[in-house]
Amino acid sequence: MAVSNAREAAVTKSEVPMSDRLAAAFALDKVQSALPGAVPMASRPIRRIECVDVSHTGGTSTRVGMVVFEDGQPQKSDYRTHALEGEAACNGDDYAALAEWMRRRLESGPPWADLVLIDGGRGQVSAVQRIVRESNAEGLFLLAGITKARDDMGRADRRAGNVGDRIFLPGRSNPLPLRDGSAELLFLQHIRDTAHHFVIGR
């Protein structure tokens, strides 16, 4: 079985065009370069990224989807959905849903991500970080959130100069200064979009 899995992984990797693999490697390197000044532990290589998104159904059923990218490539066998029903559905509360997902993820054990990317901003990141701290799991992985710029009313701000996504880290009030259209931001957006399509398609 292990030999078969290894062979399948090798075939899958060989099917990825070299240009795509090189582009992903370049983007990963740029992500790595963007983090050290803001995150002390970011000196370790970022190879495995887990990204999570929340989907609500009428506020009574909630799913949290997780996709995994390793060395810039999707690892579909590691994709997971967590269904939250009844009281655990969190009544459409993203913060509570993400906190519950983080509890379950920590209980499931390794392999750990090098970076956990949350589809959300400061509030969502803080909700997940609280569970990490309560579980004495700080240092297992980096944590970041990706979200659209917002106006004063909380709506996605699409004015000129504010159309891109923003990357937030725990303990920082301001987003990372990533340029719109940069390789690193496009790469993280692609992973977030993959998580979004995965969870709403379940």
Question: For the regions a protein language model found, what residue spans apply to each?
Answer:
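Acidic, glycine-enriched active-site microenvironments
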Residues: M1-R202
